[in-house]
């Protein structure tokens, strides 16, 4: 059963932040309650701001990130989470190396969505269309992930 879902990227201002915001909206739209979602970055810092491109894209998705503050990943985050979804294989490798006890709940977002292996590439510093492509890719995976979570949670409830 997945009740606490953590998204992780590098800086926690683009990929994981978008995944958090969009998944919260999707969960609400699907009427799925009691699922906590949050995000962190391996190099998260209050000093890093969400890029304007990301703020615009999330506004278009009705998934506001205006008050989002980048935060670093902690051991407490990992122990609290039922499911940890990362954007790059490097993120998974680093987390499992530092916290081997959580290896069984850390997955690449793309792989957990059933879309094969591979990373969700970081668009930071690239063109606006790269941010949009990243957002679209994450949104597609999230739709699959939320369906998977819904099925898993329904089967555990019965």
What are the functions of these language-model segments?
Residues 1-80, 147-157:
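Conserved active-site segments centered on acidic
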Residues 7, 85-86:
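Hydrophobic beta-strand core positions in alpha/beta domains
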Residues 16, 88-89:
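Helix N-cap/beta->alpha junction signal
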Residues 83, 89-158:
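Phosphate-binding/catalytic loops
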């Amino acid at each position: 059963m997945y009740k606490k879902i953590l998204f992780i990227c590098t800086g926690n201002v683009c990929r994981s932040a978008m995944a958090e915001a969009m998944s919260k909206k999707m969960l609400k739209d699907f009427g799925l309650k009691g699922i906590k979602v949050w995000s962190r970055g391996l190099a998260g810092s209050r000093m890093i701001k969400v890029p304007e491109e990301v703020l615009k894209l999330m506004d278009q998705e009705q998934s506001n990130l205006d008050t989002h503050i980048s935060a670093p990943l902690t051991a407490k985050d990992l122990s609290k989470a039922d499911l940890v979804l990362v954007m790059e294989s490097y993120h998974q490798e680093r987390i499992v190396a530092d916290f081997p006890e959580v290896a069984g709940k850390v997955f690449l977002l793309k792989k957990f969505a059933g879309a094969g292996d591979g990373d969700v590439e970081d668009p930071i510093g690239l063109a606006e269309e790269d941010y949009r492509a990243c957002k679209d890719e994450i949104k597609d995976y999230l739709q699959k992930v939320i369906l998977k979570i819904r099925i898993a949670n329904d089967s555990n409830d019965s």
